[in-house]
């Protein structure tokens, strides 16, 4: 057992109001500079829709994530080791600027300097790439906002698979939801596996995935390798950049900028302990619908005395273990089973999870317009947002976890309404979904009225425990899955046997050391 800690995030889609405050604040802090005008580390999409960049969920087109071979091993969908190298100078599956959008501003100066004329002056769009005027804006990062555009284009959404999507183009069957997206900081990141320069790495202390700007050579294979398309190429610097999970704030115990400024308070941050030795086994699960359950098995119970003892032996600080015990992410993902990972079928084991939305159709259920199931709760399958659509997005097509989450959320509302409004304690609904009174009351506190310290439980980092990285710095290039230690593979492109890392220690003069 190799115990590691990961700072994860849960987003409660049931409360997202689509205000884009998270996107704007992230943009102002991290990507408001030349070369990154088109990049949004955090963006909010309206679903159904093809998203940003266009059709990012279509891995047959973009070749992101992992695939399982017939021998049970996984490899990047982009290709084998040699297949990735062959694309190093000409990658045919990297998104173009038109797949994102051409960033633009407006000629505001013209409004002040325009000569007197018959018509009111207008501010025409101007490209932020070449500075030329644009005839018209044809796409943007939130072009499909509030179901903008015709349904025929939005119907290309991959989450409509195995569904009769034509019926949802009719007005009376229309549905929508918001989906805030950022880098998933996966346990099994495919961007790391496809980087020829070895510039992308995952930090052991908090699981944040970063790009070493000194080692990045701008091959852009990581952009294709990431199934969520959350790595962007800076055309000014010639380097790739991505969401850094605001690690300077995380290290000091503060939440990310998007979480701090979220108007709807939908974001939760917390620590999860996981067994790194089980990652490959979980990601190599044969059936895609089983990937969610296999990923849950990777996480460890922070209250288990044996886990605590082993974690301390392996150098996990005490404050990290205590934070994991109070983690809202662990409660929602593991205890209550409300939060689900985004597209687990990509086999990257993502660590930004989502609580499926229920609010848009709750009033319809209250009005009695839904058929009742055998119990107290209405039939969740008949609600406005199709369960299969949510399942294709959050559980690889398995409707079971989505139904469980939605039923538990509705049961919580039924119980709290009976207690607060009607003045009675009706436990029929929560008994039906397998929850206790204590669990439901805690769920209500976290989902509805959580305080700042409840939503963000982030341990401060221990810089005094950091090792000297001089020996490894800039010394780990393209290897065949063996880290910085040469290669165990029979075939070696660089014609070298396995090499053990040499620890470089500072040589001090004898008189100096006295």
Question: What spans do the regions from the language model cover?
Answer:
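Non-ligating segments of multi-cofactor redox enzymes
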Residues: 1-514
């Amino acid at each position: 057992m190799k115990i590691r800690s990961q700072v994860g995030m849960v987003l409660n889609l049931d409360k997202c109001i689509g205000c884009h405050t998270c996107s704007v604040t992230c943009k102002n802090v991290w990507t408001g500079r030349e070369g990154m005008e088109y990049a949004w580390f955090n963006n909010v999409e309206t679903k159904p829709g093809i998203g940003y960049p266009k059709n990012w969920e279509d891995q047959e087109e973009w070749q992101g994530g992992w695939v399982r071979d017939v021998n049970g091993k996984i490899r990047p969908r982009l290709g084998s080791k040699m297949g990735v190298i062959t694309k190093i100078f000409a990658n045919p599956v990297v998104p173009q600027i038109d797949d994102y959008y051409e960033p633009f501003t407006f000629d505001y100066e013209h409004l002040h300097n325009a000569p007197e004329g018959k018509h009111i002056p207008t501010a025409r769009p101007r490209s932020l790439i070449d500075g030329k005027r644009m005839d018209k804006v044809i796409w943007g990062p939130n072009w499909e906002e509030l179901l903008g555009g015709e349904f025929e284009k939005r119907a290309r959404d991959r989450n409509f698979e195995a569904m009769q999507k034509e019926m949802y183009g009719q007005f009376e069957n229309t549905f929508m939801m918001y989906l805030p997206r950022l880098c998933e900081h996966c346990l099994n990141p495919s961007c790391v596996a496809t980087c020829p320069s070895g510039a992308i790495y995952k930090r052991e202390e908090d699981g944040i995935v970063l790009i070493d700007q000194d080692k990045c050579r701008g091959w852009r294979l990581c952009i294709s390798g990431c199934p969520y398309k959350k790595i962007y190429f800076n055309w000014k610097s010639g380097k790739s950049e991505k969401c850094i999970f605001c690690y300077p704030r995380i290290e000091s115990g503060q939440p990310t900028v998007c979480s701090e400024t979220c108007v709807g308070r939908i974001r939760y941050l917390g620590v999860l302990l996981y067994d790194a030795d089980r990652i490959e086994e979980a990601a190599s699960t044969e059936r895609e619908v089983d990937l969610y359950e296999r990923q849950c098995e990777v996480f460890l119970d922070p209250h288990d005395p044996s886990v605590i003892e082993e974690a301390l032996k392996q150098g996990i600080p005490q404050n990290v273990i205590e934070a994991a015990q109070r983690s809202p992410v662990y409660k929602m993902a593991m205890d209550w089973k409300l939060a689900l990972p985004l597209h687990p079928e990509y086999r990257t084991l993502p660590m930004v999870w989502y609580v499926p939305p229920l609010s848009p159709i709750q009033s319809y259920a209250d009005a009695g317009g839904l058929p009742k199931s055998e119990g107290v709760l209405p039939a969740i399958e008949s609600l406005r947002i199709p369960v299969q659509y949510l399942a294709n997005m959050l559980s690889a097509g398995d409707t079971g976890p989505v139904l469980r989450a939605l039923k538990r959320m509705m049961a919580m509302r039924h119980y709290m309404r009976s207690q607060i409004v009607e003045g009675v304690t009706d436990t029929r609904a929560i008994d039906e979904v397998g929850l206790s009174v204590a669990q439901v009351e805690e769920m209500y506190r976290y989902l509805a009225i959580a305080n700042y310290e409840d939503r963000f439980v982030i341990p401060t980092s221990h810089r005094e425990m950091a090792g000297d990285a001089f020996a490894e710095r800039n010394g780990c290039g393209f290897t065949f899955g063996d880290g910085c230690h040469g290669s165990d593979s029979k075939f070696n492109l660089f014609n070298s046997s396995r090499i053990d890392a040499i620890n470089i220690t500072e040589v001090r003069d004898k008189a100096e050391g006295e």
